Amino acid sequence: PDVIVDAATLTGACVVALGPELIGLFGNDDALKARLRAAGDATGEAVWELPLWRDYDELIKSDIADFKNTGGREGGAITAALFLSKFVGPHPWAHLDIAGPVWAKKDRPIIPKGASGVGVRLLVRMLRDWPT
């Protein structure tokens, strides 16, 4: 693939870090992350980049497997993204942690209370703006 983008309600840790309205962004490619931030700005689906802190790879090491899918309580959003990064190979990749804004607790300017569909506008905009 040219790029890989995944969106998931992967951890509650991102909600703790960013609250209920921001999408957490992780990735290994600055240009792809910039496209996602621009699409978020254009659509009102706010994206905030968090680090893929490679020192935390230690937290997902395992004695019985290649690695484990949780690194414990601290840095949970980062270790979850590090876990995902193990499966993308050499491809440009971004992970959108949508756990916070996936459910709107109140009406917001572009999203009514309830299931938000967050990420759809952002991804459609990114694809629409992608150079051909």
Annotated model-derived regions:
Residues 1-132:
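A generic structural signal for tightly packed, nonpolar segments enriched in small/aliphatic residues
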